[in-house]
């Protein structure tokens, strides 16, 4: 606007040369008042994260298995804004990036470790234990004396459970740029001892005495909380099981 006004005044006072000088002064004034303009990059409008359904069972893991896990806590998405460009009449560009913190339950019994992790089918954490994107990871192995996670303590205070007896992981500030700024589908390679003795352990847990050879063919097993009879029937397809009922 100042460009037009000062250009017109300059033309009236000093002719064409005055108009050029006035227009130049006007452009400088416009930049001071209006600025160089700004471009906004894509930005999310919904920052809440959905967690797993209440009451969803957490399986017991044996041996080496790959599981999706269940999200038991999540923060809202954290938004970061960065501005680049500008100067010499060029507009500034604002870009947005997002991260999330979340806890994912893996097993209802203790585990030894978590090896590889995939996000949307791509390797997120390799055998060396390094995340392929920004953020950090903590593994809680599910022992009876495990302390609460420090991030959950900071967020939930006195309401924070330790999830003793439940193995879970906590991602802190997991960067989401590589996943379309959304929480990706996760899967975890979990090592939980040996699966060869799973039949005996499940039988004893449900009040049975099981006498059988180890299930040598079994590298891993996911016990989803079904009945002992159903579970042992599945395992009996791999090796003969001798099972006796032990009354209470």
Q: What kind of feature is each model-predicted range?
A:
Residues 16, 20-247:
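Polar, S/T/G-rich
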Residues 1-19, 205-206:
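Short hydrophobic membrane-inserting alpha-helices and related fusion/pore-forming segments
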